[in-house]
């Protein structure tokens, strides 16, 4: 893709796959109407050697029409001409749109090396032109249609990382892969996304506008993934295996979230497995895939050629009870985003993408127990109590102060499933009524006590 009008250099690399030295060769290219030839002489290309060339004739792009380009070599001594020709299409654009990359991470709670991918995505959160998606395997967060097909673009073991389904590597290299892809010229952009959660229907509605900056030939589609942060459950199937903890094979490798992500939790000091609440829950989790098709929604963009202009699409509503892991963690719309991608359905390449936080309508009253203000409606519809009277009955808050320097708030009292401690502390010991220590933990805002 190039900005119209412009002249394009025809460049390439010649590789000598034969035994004989190549001293001269003809390089030709055609736009379907005219053919241009360079007779290259004085060469010294040995067996398996290479030579980089730039053709003396440039391709002139002076419209938004697609330019078919064929480049080939002619060498009389070549016994195998099957690998001498390359064909591509060069399209003119009216401008260069901003590029956003998508980093997909293959992960699973069963995978002891997978904290590496979680930390890598956490490190990329400060990069606004990067969108991270965690694609889970073999655990309650798995979306079969996503998990079954992501290996086509990110082959190999776990964890695995890839950007735009073009580059794939260790997820620790997300930053490098992003830097490579974000400078690529693409012919399209996601202009806007509207994502609304309706609590009266428990459905998520997403609409988008995409824009193509030229007349682009191909099969392109729009795709939407709902992602959510801070997913945690006391169910043991949500515990994360961890090879980076004390005595683990990876303990010598620093595996710590940035300070502003998950409170800087370090897997290096955590046991295995790690309860999800200990590290603040799973982030960037793919919870739904539109049309259950990794290549996007068929018919969401014109087929054959997508002409210059804007295109609107409304995705099929998502029922929240169909979200991956819903039975364990439900859905918190305040921590969810809609990711819209423009995908080449032939190659799988993600050309561009956008992300937006969900908004809401028809939110019902609910209440949380605030240690200072008592029962408060958070306005999210997902407070811990659906009735104010129930909240008032349970909201018996204890406050502990020491020397006017340290202050802690603990609630609810009595505690049932989770104990919330508001305040700064290093560690906590919990004792039963007989004075026996039943739990020792490092700093956590929320402590699971279901098993006590």
Where are these regions (language model features)?
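Residue-level detector of functionally pivotal "anchor" positions at catalytic/ligand-binding pockets or at interdomain
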Residues: 1-4, 92-101, 359-364, 395-411
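Short, solvent-exposed loop/linker segments at the N-terminal edge
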Residues: 1-7, 197-201, 411-415
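Asparagine-centered strand-capping/turn motif at beta-strand->loop junctions
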Residues: 13-18, 212
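Intrinsically disordered, low-complexity Pro/Gly/Ser/Thr-rich segments with frequent PxxP/GP/PP motifs
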Residues: 34-62
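Terminal connector regions
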Residues: 60-92, 342
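C-terminal outer-membrane/trafficking sorting elements
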Residues: 401-452
């Amino acid at each position: 893709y190039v900005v119209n009008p412009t002249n394009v250099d025809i460049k390439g690399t010649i590789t000598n796959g034969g035994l004989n030295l190549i001293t001269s060769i003809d390089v030709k290219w055609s736009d379907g109407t005219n053919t241009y030839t360079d007779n290259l002489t004085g060469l010294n290309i040995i067996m398996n050697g290479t030579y980089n060339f730039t053709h003396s004739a440039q391709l002139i792009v002076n419209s938004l029409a697609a330019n078919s380009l064929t480049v080939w070599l002619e060498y009389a001594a070549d016994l195998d001409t099957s690998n001498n020709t390359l064909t591509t299409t060069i399209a003119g654009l009216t401008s260069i749109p901003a590029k956003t990359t998508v980093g997909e991470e293959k992960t699973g709670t069963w995978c002891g090396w997978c904290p590496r991918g979680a930390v890598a995505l956490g490190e990329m959160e400060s990069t606004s032109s990067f969108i991270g998606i965690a694609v889970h395997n073999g655990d309650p967060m798995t979306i079969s249609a996503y998990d079954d097909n992501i290996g086509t673009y990110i082959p190999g073991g776990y964890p695995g990382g890839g950007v735009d389904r073009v580059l794939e590597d260790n997820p620790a290299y997300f930053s490098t892969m992003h830097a490579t892809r974000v400078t690529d010229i693409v012919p399209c952009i996601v202009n806007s996304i509207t994502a609304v959660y309706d609590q009266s229907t428990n459905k998520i509605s997403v609409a988008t506008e995409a824009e193509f900056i030229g007349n682009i030939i191909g099969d392109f589609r729009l795709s939407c993934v709902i992602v959510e942060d801070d997913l945690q459950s006391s169910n043991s199937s949500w515990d994360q295996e961890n090879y980076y903890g004390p005595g683990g094979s990876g303990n010598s490798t620093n595996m710590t979230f940035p300070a502003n992500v998950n409170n800087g939790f370090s897997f290096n000091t955590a046991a295995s497995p790690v309860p999800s609440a200990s590290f603040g829950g799973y982030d960037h989790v793919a919870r739904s895939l539109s049309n259950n098709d990794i290549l996007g929604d068929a018919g969401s963009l014109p087929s054959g050629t997508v002409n210059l202009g804007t295109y609107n699409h409304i995705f099929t509503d998502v029922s929240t009870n169909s979200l991956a892991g819903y039975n364990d963690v439900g859905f918190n719309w305040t921590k969810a985003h809609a990711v819209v991608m423009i995908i080449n359905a032939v190659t799988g390449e993600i050309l561009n993408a956008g992300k937006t936080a969900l908004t809401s309508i028809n939110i019902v009253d609910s209440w949380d127990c605030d240690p200072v203000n008592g029962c408060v409606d958070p306005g999210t519809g997902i407070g811990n109590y659906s009735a104010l009277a129930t909240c008032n009955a349970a909201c018996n808050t204890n406050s502990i102060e020491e020397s006017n320097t340290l202050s802690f708030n603990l609630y609810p009292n009595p505690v049932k499933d989770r104990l919330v401690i508001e305040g700064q502390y290093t560690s906590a010991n919990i004792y039963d009524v007989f004075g026996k220590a039943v739990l020792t933990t490092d700093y956590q805002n929320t402590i699971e006590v279901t098993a006590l």
